[in-house]
């Protein structure tokens, strides 16, 4: 059964709500697919394409930051005069930090699109990396600002982001956990997480988009477009609220949410209510 408009709209809403929260949007889309009337995993391609919508929200929200970083990076490399060294370095770190997820994404492409979408793996990753986030939030020193980001840490952020190729890890959850463990403030870790995602998510989304042109799309292009638009609108609202919350609030509600959802998923799998797939 093909996916209907209401289902696609719901998945777009879910993508927008969960992409920037440390709860794994890919896990939520993977799980939700099992309960929809069409009863199917929307697939890695649908997930990647709808993420273009949420990353457009990042571009809009962080436009002035991105332009400032890009200008400093260009002025440094084209020797156009004075530039902000911290912004130029951040530009390089976003580029270098994107390398791990690109390399590993291409190397493990088949596993990412098939075997790693097994819901048992998703459930375990939700629990394990939820606990990691909780520990990071508790023991992290939270003293460094984004303009203090160094090369070593920027690259470690990149490897943490690459872990999110496994549904259940969470791209933002992995990078935020890494940032907290490295001593960065909650807001600094979250902001760099959002900026670091731009090249990787756009790259993955447009790769899947162009790859899918001319092929049979099990979801439907109209439905995919609707989901992407909804993901953009909802994602922007989530960024606004989330960045206000993380400056003063703990990540523990997200930790408990991940752990509970992970165990519920294991129970549903164990009792045969849903199949693991993958």
From Swiss-Prot:
Keywords: Antibiotic resistance, Cell inner membrane, Cell membrane, Cell shape, Cell wall biogenesis/degradation, Hydrolase, Membrane, Peptidoglycan synthesis, Transmembrane, Transmembrane helix. Catalyzes the dephosphorylation of undecaprenyl diphosphate (UPP). Confers resistance to bacitracin. GO terms for cellular component: plasma membrane. The keyword Transmembrane helix applies. InterPro entries: UppP (IPR003824). HAMAP family: Undec_diphosphatase. Bacitracin is thought to be involved in the inhibition of peptidoglycan synthesis by sequestering undecaprenyl diphosphate, thereby reducing the pool of lipid carrier available. GO terms for molecular function: undecaprenyl-diphosphatase activity. GO terms for biological process: cell wall organization; peptidoglycan biosynthetic process; regulation of cell shape; response to antibiotic. Belongs to the UppP family. The chain crosses the membrane at residues 43-63, 88-108, 119-139, 149-169, 194-214, 226-246, 254-274. It is a multi-pass membrane protein. PANTHER family: UNDECAPRENYL-DIPHOSPHATASE. It is an enzyme of class 3 (hydrolase). Its EC number is 3.6.1.27. It is found in: Cell inner membrane. This is Undecaprenyl-diphosphatase 2. It catalyses: di-trans,octa-cis-undecaprenyl diphosphate + H2O = di-trans,octa-cis-undecaprenyl phosphate + phosphate + H(+).
